[in-house]
């Protein structure tokens, strides 16, 4: 039904479309409620606004000019990251004030609870590879803390693949990107408890108006979720098999060491870690990464450790033939720079 209308010129009553697609997605995922938003970042901002505004018509229209005593959003310090924009900016857009719990290298359930005050409105948990992973409480632990303090737990799971795990772990609102693991259009998905999702939907007449999602995004994401739930998914072991010849080719290059590494956030994703001994290659890794973007094929890597001479290749969206092109291109750039 949703697929057929995508390719026609149709008019929609947007509130009705939001409600019906949300109910349909919620049924697909076996959750209480769901709604499509413009992106995961908008989902964070609107979720924060939702737990502050709730049913207040006044706050809906005057969120940023009305003092709100209970506006603190508690977040593990190691989750206060920049994912392309600061998490704190999204919280502030939603009217919240960020309060960090624990330390940059650890946050236990006790440390999270210690940051809660009478001014706390919600707990925010960021499930992302950008965040510190070691010595951090998991979503279930955060949910237990939230429940014991009668607070909602908001989980940003933008790039996560499991569309049910964090809801089942006790989160009240969970936010996903429509364009990452789901591979849909630029959009976001918010699922959760009925009351909280309804409060998020109210934000279409508040801050959400500036983050409005169109019918194309709503229907496109709905179709993408349908497909995502039924399509076969490449396992980590299949990724390893695909990248093994690629790694072997790279290990024949002087000063290059490649190996399989697994996703630091715990997902079933295998990647190729490529380490360059710059004393041997004579090439700065940052310069190499930039050069690889400039060829006939623009090749991009995960470059979070490029300053250490390490990059990672995510092979989920490429095939074996394309990996051959990548390894050949790396060899070409290294030889060119070394002989320059």
What are the functions of these language-model segments?
Residues 229-262:
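Conserved PLP-dependent catalytic core of the aminotransferase class-I/II
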Residues 251-331:
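Conserved C-terminal alpha-helix-loop-beta "cap" of PLP-dependent enzymes
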């Amino acid at each position: 039904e949703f697929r057929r209308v995508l390719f026609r010129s149709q008019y929609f009553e947007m509130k009705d479309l939001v409600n019906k697609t949300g109910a349909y997605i919620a049924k697909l995922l076996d959750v209480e409620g769901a709604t499509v938003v413009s992106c995961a970042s908008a989902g964070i901002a609107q979720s924060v606004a939702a737990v502050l505004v709730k049913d207040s018509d006044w706050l809906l229209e005057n969120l940023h000019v009305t003092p709100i005593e209970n506006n603190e959003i508690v977040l593990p310090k190691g989750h206060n990251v920049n994912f392309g924009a600061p998490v704190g900016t999204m919280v502030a857009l939603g009217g919240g004030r960020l309060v960090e719990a624990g330390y940059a290298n650890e946050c236990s359930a006790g440390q999270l609870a210690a940051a809660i005050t009478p001014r706390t409105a919600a707990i925010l948990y960021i499930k992302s590879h950008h965040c510190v992973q070691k010595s951090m409480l998991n979503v279930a632990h955060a949910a237990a803390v939230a429940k014991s303090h009668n607070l909602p737990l908001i989980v940003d799971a933008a790039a996560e693949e499991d569309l049910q795990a964090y809801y089942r772990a006790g989160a009240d609102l969970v936010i996903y990107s429509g364009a990452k693991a789901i591979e849909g259009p630029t959009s976001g998905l918010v699922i959760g408890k009925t009351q909280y999702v309804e409060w998020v939907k109210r934000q279409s007449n508040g801050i959400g108006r500036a983050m409005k999602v169109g019918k194309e995004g709503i229907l496109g994401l709905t179709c993408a979720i349908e497909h995502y739930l039924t399509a076969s998914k490449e396992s980590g072991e299949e990724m390893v098999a695909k990248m093994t010849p690629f790694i072997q080719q790279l290990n024949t290059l002087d000063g290059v060491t490649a190996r399989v590494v697994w996703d630091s956030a715990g997902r079933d994703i295998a990647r190729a870690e490529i380490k360059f001994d710059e004393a041997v290659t004579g090439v700065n890794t940052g310069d190499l990464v930039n050069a690889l973007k400039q060829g006939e094929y623009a090749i991009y890597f995960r470059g979070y450790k490029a300053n250490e001479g390490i990059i990672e290749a995510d092979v989920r969206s490429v095939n074996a033939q394309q990996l051959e092109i990548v390894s050949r291109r790396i060899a070409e750039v290294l030889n060119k720079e070394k002989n320059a």
